[in-house]
A protein has these predicted regions:
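Residues that form or immediately flank small-molecule/cofactor binding pockets and catalytic motifs
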Residues: 6, 34, 73-74, 184-187
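Bilobed "Venus flytrap"/periplasmic-binding protein-like clamshell domains
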Residues: 1-62, 157-162
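Secondary-structure end/capping motifs
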Residues: 92-174
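Pocket-lining segment of extracytoplasmic ligand-binding domains
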Residues: 36-129
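Residue-level detector of short coil/turn "hinge" positions at structural boundaries
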Residues: 24, 67, 174-175
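Conserved C-terminal helix/tail region of periplasmic/extracytoplasmic solute-binding proteins
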Residues: 161-195
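Residue-level detector of family-conserved "landmark" positions at structurally sensitive sites
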Residues: 27, 70-71, 135, 154, ...
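Short hydrophobic/aromatic-rich motifs at helix boundaries and adjacent loops
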Residues: 10-11, 28-30, 59, 80-81, ...
Length: 195
């Protein structure tokens, strides 16, 4: 179960398959189920494998419905799943806000780099009130051991190129965009330097 065509989980999965020498035509990737519903479909008996974000992956394990056998993220390289985008006009008018926001995010990155999975889980637990602390800790530990979190927020050109390569390979990008035109690392670099 890959989620819908054009969704990042499915596109990154196809990219990893290609990197491992597996032609996507040799596997049956079900793209008929919305990504938010794949865990339930898998629990219900659909598919031999599923691609899941957390907490779905850990919950499948805890229910005995599946096992995490590999991390697509570990195999793909640093894919910039989350980024902050603003128009140039906003950046010009509200640069101080972007700077404060970036510094706050960097503080979170610094915290993750200097604390144990147990400490991180305790701090973030109130944001996940419906999830038990033990589950949150298991998820954080998995991400921690996989080196999921970078040390800083700098959106490197290599990651930008990787993202575009994934989109292009999936048939979702007709023309690559120039990194220097679309990305500024000024605020992230300043926040990392002050960290």
């Amino acid at each position: 179960l890959g989620g819908r065509k054009g969704g990042m989980p499915e596109m990154v999965f196809e990219y990893v398959l290609a990197q491992k020498g597996i032609d996507k035509k040799d596997v049956n990737i079900n793209q008929s189920i919305d990504f938010g519903s794949t865990a339930a479909a898998f629990s219900g008996g659909q598919g031999d494998y599923t691609i899941e974000f957390e907490p779905s992956a850990t919950l499948l394990e805890q229910k005995g419905d599946g096992y995490v056998v590999a991390s697509v993220g570990t195999e793909s390289g640093y894919v910039p799943y989350t980024s902050y985008s603003v128009k140039q006009s906003y950046l010009k008018m509200h640069g101080a806000t972007v700077e404060k926001f970036t510094k706050a995010l960097q503080k979170g990155m610094d915290f993750v780099q200097t604390h144990t999975p147990e400490e991180i889980a305790e701090v973030i637990a109130p944001q996940f009130a419906e999830t038990e602390l033990e589950t949150i800790t298991a998820i954080v530990r998995r991400y921690y051991e996989q080196d999921t979190w970078k040390e800083n927020l700098i959106f490197e050109e290599e990651s930008f190129d990787l993202l575009q390569e994934i989109l292009e390979q999936a048939g979702e990008l007709e023309k690559k965009a120039p990194y220097k035109t679309l990305v500024t690392t000024k605020y992230a670099e300043e926040a990392a330097a002050k960290g």
